[in-house]
Design a protein with these regions (language model features):
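Active-site-adjacent C-terminal substructures of enzyme catalytic domains
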Residues: 43-44, 53-111
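Metal-coordinating catalytic core of metallo-dependent amide/deamination hydrolases
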Residues: 1-55
Length: 111
């Protein structure tokens, strides 16, 4: 993805976000974006596991993302992978509230 490299060279980007949900982008699509950002030396963040357990936490960890945002449906393996990779879980309670999400993230698991 030449655009990421160009933006990095111009000093116009400090991180790249990807959104991994079945109604948004697949893990394969997000993986391409995360790899391109890493190749350009740009830190990454992932929005995932908000609406379902789509493996967003594990994907974020596998690519060394700074954060995985939302995490309402993150499973134990994803949480462990993030802990090992140093990827921080960012909880966004206002997003859950406004989307009327009834599932709450397992805060104890994510600590």
């Amino acid at each position: 993805m030449p655009l990421i490299s160009l933006l990095q060279e111009e000093g116009l980007v400090d991180a790249v976000d990807a959104a991994c949900e079945r109604v948004l982008f697949t893990s394969e699509q997000c993986g391409r974006v995360l790899r391109a950002a890493a190749a350009a030396g740009v830190p990454t963040r992932l929005h995932g596991d908000q609406l379902s357990d789509g493996g967003g936490a594990a994907l974020a960890a596998a690519h060394g993302a700074l954060t995985c945002d939302h995490c309402e449906h993150t499973n134990d393996a994803g949480a462990r992978a993030m802990a090992e990779a140093g990827t921080v879980a960012v909880l966004l309670p206002a997003a859950s509230y406004f989307s009327q999400e009834t599932v709450r993230p397992d805060v104890a698991m994510l600590r």
